[in-house]
Swiss-Prot record:
This protein's encoding gene: argB
Coiled-coil features, chain-numbered ranges: none
Protein name as catalogued: Acetylglutamate kinase
Binding, substrate: G66, G67, R88, N193
One Pfam family of this chain: AA_kinase
HAMAP family: ArgB
Homology family: Belongs to the acetylglutamate kinase family. ArgB subfamily.
Chief localisation class: cytoplasm
Reactions performed catalytically: N-acetyl-L-glutamate + ATP = N-acetyl-L-glutamyl 5-phosphate + ADP
Amino acid sequence: MPMRNQVEKVKVLIEALPYMRRFEGKTFVIKYGGNAMVDEDLKSAFAQDVILMRQVGINPIIVHGGGPQIGLIMKRMGLEPKFIDGLRVTDEDTMSVVEMVLAGKVNKDIVNLINLNGGRAAGLSGKDGYTIQARKRTHVRKGPDVQVPEIIDLGWVGDVERIETNLLDRFRASDIIPVVAPVGVGANGETYNINADSVAGHIAIAMQAEKLILLTDVPGVQDKNGTLINQIDETDVDKLIRNGTVTGGMIPKLETCRTAHTGGVNASHIIDGRVEHALLLEIFTDSGIGTVLR
């Protein structure tokens, strides 16, 4: 190996060491989704990143999505997906598929991925230990094309009511990395489909996490010229939404980050999961690769 390459590797370690020391014993909640869950190289890199985090004393908690996988199984079963304002309408049949795919398939695939790469992971859904307590979402449809706001019944779509931390606390005290499926449970045992970003944000608050990290399929928050915005604060969120800089699916992600920050999470990151080792590049380098809200 050329001496220059060896020197560069040493520089990387020197840059990372202060961050490793600073974050030892801290909890990071990571929303895992998008292309990082599909591409084989990215999947391996993600597993290696969270294992390294655990080995240097960071406590990662993974919350995952699974929209494309749900859509694929629904298609095979002859069920037609329906969305309103970007939210999946979840009737009884759809809820059965959602729970089966998220808790039974996607969750265990991620657990297996981490274990095969040398880590120790265990999966759970929000039903386990009554971890994600939920209520039915009341969705009000409004916008430029809606003259009179109307309440829409989305079926078994829920919002987080409360996070019970007992199981997650036990994982944190061990070497096991928890992998959480965003399926919640209601007061009467109802099953709810909940947005994974929202679940991650609420878990970050409940676990008093140092960081919330959302993996996406874009570089982060971008200005109107497509240039990455490296850092924002709470007051920037409404401005970016009002002036149209942030649109579509980035809006709820930013709102989740703001809610987490208000709830005591020190920093929330939106990063590009299409970049190999995106997690390590964001948390162990001076420049990072995405957008951080502090």
